[in-house]
Amino acid sequence: MAATMKDIARRTGLGLATISSYFNGGNVREKNRIKIEEAIEELHYEVNEVARGLKTNATRTIGVVIPELNNTFCAEIITGMEDILRSHGYATIVCDCRTDKKLEREAVEFLTRRRVDGIINMPVDEEGNHLKRFQKTGKPIVLIDRKIQGINCDSVLVDNKKAAEDAVRYFIERGHRNIGIIGGPEEVFTAQERMAGYSKALESAGIPVSESLIWHGDYTIQGGVRGLEELVQNNPEMTAVFVTNYEMTMGAMIGVNELGIRIPEQLSMIGFDNLQFARACNPKLTIVAQPTDGIAKEVAKVMLNHLENTGEASGELFSEKLETEIIAGKSVRVLA
């Protein structure tokens, strides 16, 4: 038979109130904490988080819903967040919705049934009705990377518009004018922001935006391959291309190799994220680097502030845009 809190109380000689306070994160004297932890180990006691959640309305679990678990950007953020949340006694349930709106809705519904204390979401669905339903529980939501109209919640974003603007300006300052872009899905917030930055940089330099130099991809490796091939085929005058996420950057490099294009002699390129991949390329790839560590820390901090400082909540929504950085390689040629 499994050990109970009463068994721990008998073993330690402490009252049930003290034992309960320990398990619910309350203040317990150090000598009592040691007694309780020794008894837990001796009795092989396991906390029934679901049962405790029914009593306290807190399960000390956080739901995380992301579009692609094998996406480097997502994976690095999850790792950083989990480390911080775990250090505060919270576990995470990670749901990979595979960039599928239906799977995302199902994931949020599943997490709601599991009575998670909050949800961290990098959203795919731009309507967010499933998130609105979760908000009715009174529990917090923190959005990463993308905002949803009509959802009043905290968000930690990257300044994607400026990221793209900086990358395109980097080309322009080195003499490039025929600059292509491999963008993301047109309906995705980050893709819209990056496309807006691309257009703004060109317009600020007096360079007309040409539709033939724009490829709307799908944030996949294969999308990067197709985008590179289409842009090169349709734009023989193109001297540079900006690829707007890591997976498509990998795909674009595959496309370059398959077509026998020399970087940067025949085509200059700026990619997105993953410094290790950029360093492995020959020549080393110039990239836009997103602050994944900073995003992870901010998201965890905002969520923990909701869960652990409820009495101090100001009622104001938190929204922050973090800056990206261009890490120069040798993939951009200076034109005479």
For each feature predicted by the language model, list its residue ranges:
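Flexible loop/turn connectors
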Residues: 229-336
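N-terminal helix-turn-helix DNA-binding module of bacterial transcription factors
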Residues: 1-60, 336
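Short gly/ser/thr-rich secondary-structure transition/capping motifs
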Residues: 42-48, 102, 122-124, 253
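Short acidic capping loops at alpha-helix termini that bridge into adjacent secondary structure
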Residues: 177-178, 209-213, 262-268
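Hinge/beta->alpha junction and helix N-cap segments in small-molecule ligand-binding domains
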Residues: 66-76, 94-103, 146, 156-166, ...
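Alpha-helical recognition/docking segments in bacterial nutrient-uptake
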Residues: 3-4, 34, 53, 57-173, ...
